[in-house]
Amino acid sequence: MIQVLLVTICLAAFPYQGSSIILESGNVNDYEVVYPRKVTALPKGAVQQKYEDAMQYEFKVNGEPVVLHLEKNKGLFSKDYSEIHYSPDGRRITTHPLVEDHCYYRGHIRNDADSTASISACNGLKGHFKLQGEMYLIEPMKMSYSEAHAVYKYGNVEKEDEAPKMCGVTQNWESYEPIKKASQLIVSTEFQRYMEIVIVVDHSMVKKYNGDSDKIKAWVYEMINTITESYSYLYIDIILSGLEIWSEKDLINVETSAENTLKSFGEWRAKDLIHRISHDNAQLLTATDFDGPTIGLAYVASMCDPKRSVGVVQDHSSVNRLVAITLAHEMAHNLGVRHDEGSCSCGSGYTCIMSPVINSEVIKYFSDCSYIQCREYISKENPPCILNKPLRTDTVSTPVSGNELLEAGKDYD
């Protein structure tokens, strides 16, 4: 027998339309105030977790009721996930936090087969969902006395900077010829791959977020949760193996030149990071404003290479999804994916992830071209580091090392 626990998050049962508001994502024009109602089904006698494996929320969008179904992203963290920061005297401190009961979810809207959702439920609902072909953002409103949330379309966020933003990769590498049509590629479970990544946050990010490591972590977790949704189309699982925060100073010279920073980061990874944390790919997240319109750069077709399986990404927007898409873009270059051209498509009217320019349009998915190029790169090169399937965090019955602290010079097995 199933007992249904109905939790009314707010007594208000009606939405409210607003014209302008300042939210975490920036100034938003034309938003809707909603009061989600949580409906959770628990088996009789089951222990209530802080964050259930599956949850449902009911609210209204444009006056129509919707049911948001969420399932915990259990593959988000590796079983030996670690976090690293540095003490004022330069000691490296490594922790292995318990991440089994995290608050990051993927999901869909009930009765909308084409819907998707990527949501943080840590403090209210924050993230995005696609409903009837439209991308909506949702986040709690800054009112301590209420559980009100704002729902709005991405296009209603006032742009921070109208200047075009671009990936620094140029189209000067060899393509895999001939390019097949998507229908000619055979898809089976043998094509599933698993990319364990480490995110390195530089000191400019620490300054940008006023030294608030919890805020930095939440920002990164939300990004990774978003890109796991995007990469499922390419049959690639993205798993976060580690998060390193350069809390006191940068360990490389982070320059406004994206090219120089990428080179330095790759060299540092090969001589340092790769020996401390098991991972396949590393990305540097920086608040440094790269020269010109560049907001990201990565080596192409370089997966598993110690120096070149890396990218650098500028934290260029207050909209988490936009930075996450930039991260997904640079990682795809490592997987042999090129910039989209005019014939590439990810749905009518949509801008695709591998567009060389980020503009005001909603960026949705990888294109058909990206799918083909990724599959052909994997088929031809078969990068070995992404073949092994890591254990998920929910398979670990006890913590590996609890919250063990390690100083510089001590290794973790």
Curated annotation (Swiss-Prot):
GO MF terms held by the record: calcium ion binding; metalloendopeptidase activity; toxin activity; zinc ion binding
Cofactor note: Binds 1 zinc ion per subunit.
A Pfam family: Reprolysin
Superkingdom per UniProt: Eukaryota
Chain positions recorded as Zn(2+) binding sites: 329, 333, 339
Residue positions binding Ca(2+): 196, 280, 385, 388
Major localisation: secreted
Keywords (A to Z) from UniProt: Calcium, Disulfide bond, Hemorrhagic toxin, Hemostasis impairing toxin, Hydrolase, Metal-binding, Metalloprotease, Protease, Secreted, Signal, Toxin, Zinc, Zymogen
Signal sequence extent: 1-20
Intrachain disulfide bonds: 304-385, 344-369, 346-352
Catalytic residues, chain numbering: 330
Localization per Swiss-Prot or TrEMBL: Secreted
Tissue: Expressed by the venom gland.
Enzyme Commission no: 3.4.24.-
Residues excised as propeptide: 21-187, 391-413
Cofactor requirement: Zn(2+)
Gene Ontology BP, a term: venom-mediated hemorrhage in another organism
Domain Peptidase M12B: 193-390
InterPro entries (UniProt xref): MetalloPept_cat_dom_sf (IPR024079), Peptidase_M12B (IPR001590), Peptidase_M12B_N (IPR002870), Reprolysin_adamalysin (IPR034027)
GO cellular component labels: extracellular region; plasma membrane
Functional description taken from the UniProt entry: This protein is a zinc metalloprotease from snake venom that possesses hemorrhagic activity.
UniProt record similarity statement: Belongs to the venom metalloproteinase (M12B) family. P-I subfamily.
Quaternary context: Monomer.
Identification of the protein by name: Snake venom metalloproteinase acutolysin-A
Organism: Deinagkistrodon acutus (Hundred-pace snake)
